[in-house]
UniProtKB/Swiss-Prot annotation:
Essential component of the PAM complex, a complex required for the translocation of transit peptide-containing proteins from the inner membrane into the mitochondrial matrix in an ATP-dependent manner. In the complex, it is required to regulate activity of mtHSP70 (ssc1) via its interaction with PAM18/TIM14. May act by positioning pam18/tim14 in juxtaposition to mtHSP70 at the translocon to maximize ATPase stimulation. The keyword ATP-binding does not apply. GO terms for cellular component: mitochondrion; PAM complex, Tim23 associated import motor; TIM23 mitochondrial import inner membrane translocase complex. The keyword Mitochondrion applies. The J-like region, although related to the J domain does not stimulate ATPase activity of mtHSP70. It nevertheless mediates the heterodimerization with the J domain of PAM18 and is therefore essential for PAM complex function. It comes from Schizosaccharomyces pombe (strain 972 / ATCC 24843). Heterodimer with pam18. Component of the PAM complex, at least composed of mtHsp70, mge1, tim44, pam16, pam17 and pam18. One of its GO terms (biological process) is protein import into mitochondrial matrix. Residues 117-128 have a biased composition (Polar residues). This is Mitochondrial import inner membrane translocase subunit tim16. The lineage of its organism: Eukaryota, Fungi, Dikarya, Ascomycota, Taphrinomycotina.
C-alpha cells in the first residue's frame, strides 16, 4: 500500500470515528437536558426562595430541629423559645444566630398557617 493511499484511508476512518462520537454526544446531551428539565420543575420553588434571599422550609426546620412534615404549633413555639433564649446576646449568645432562629420561626409559622387554611373548609359568603 502506498503512503498517499494510507494517509487517505487514515483521514476517512478518523473522520468516521469523530462523526459517530459527535452524534453520540449530541444524543446524550438531549437525554440529559430532558432529564434535567423534570428535576428542575420539582426544585424550582425552593430555588426561587433562595434566589430571593428567603429561608427554605428545610433550612428553617433544621435550625429549630423540627421536621416540616410533622409541624405542630405547640412544638414550634416550644423549640423557638428554647433556641431564642439560648442565643440571647445578654447571656453570651449570638445576635446573628438569634435572628436566624427568629426567621426560621417566621417561615415555619407561615407554613403552618398556610396548612391550616388549606385544611379548613372554605366558608361560603352569603349576601343579604
Amino acid at each position: 500500500m502506498s503512503l498517499p493511499r494510507a494517509v487517505g484511508r487514515f483521514i476517512i476512518v478518523g473522520s468516521q470515528v469523530m462523526s459517530k462520537a459527535f452524534v453520540q454526544a449530541y444524543k446524550q446531551m438531549i437525554a440529559n437536558a430532558a432529564q434535567q428539565s423534570t428535576g428542575q420543575a420539582a426544585a424550582s420553588k425552593s430555588s426561587t426562595a433562595v434566589r430571593r434571599g428567603e429561608m427554605t422550609i428545610q433550612e428553617a426546620g433544621s435550625i429549630l430541629n423540627i421536621k416540616p412534615e410533622s409541624l405542630e404549633e405547640g412544638e414550634l413555639e416550644k423549640r423557638f423559645q428554647k433556641m431564642f433564649e439560648i442565643n440571647d446576646p445578654k447571656k453570651g449568645g449570638s445576635f446573628y444566630l438569634q435572628s436566624k432562629v427568629f426567621r426560621a420561626h417566621e417561615k415555619l409559622k407561615s407554613e403552618l398557617d398556610q396548612k391550616i387554611q388549606e385544611q379548613s373548609p372554605a366558608k361560603p359568603t352569603s349576601s343579604p
